[in-house]
């Protein structure tokens, strides 16, 4: 069985959301506004992978990713 550290998993989730945001031609500001997540939270997530479950689900609801 392959184990992935939680930090690596979080960073991969952040990469997926970022890629989907770019595919949708959304800026960070645009995604933050549409999702109701603060811009600083989104930036931190894309850089470090750190985010609350609630904020992650909000981003996911917009990106479908």
Task: List each language-model region with its residue ranges.
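Helix-turn-helix/winged-helix DNA-binding modules
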Residues: 23, 34, 48-51
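A short, Lys/Arg-rich alpha-helix, primarily the initiator
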Residues: 1-23
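A generic secondary-structure micro-motif detector
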Residues: 7, 45-46
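Short alpha-helical DNA-recognition segment
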Residues: 25-43
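Short C-terminal boundary/hinge segments that cap the last helix of small helical domains
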Residues: 64-65
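Residues that mark the N-terminal boundary/hinge immediately upstream of a DNA-recognition element
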Residues: 16, 27, 52-55
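Short, basic-rich loop-to-helix N-cap that marks the start of a DNA-contacting helix
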Residues: 48-61
């Amino acid at each position: 069985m392959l184990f992935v550290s939680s930090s690596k998993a979080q960073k991969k989730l952040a990469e997926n959301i970022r890629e989907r945001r770019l595919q949708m031609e959304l800026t960070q500001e645009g995604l933050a506004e549409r999702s109701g997540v603060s811009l600083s939270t989104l930036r931190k997530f894309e850089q470090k992978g750190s985010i609350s479950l609630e904020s992650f689900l909000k981003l996911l609801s917009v990106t479908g990713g």
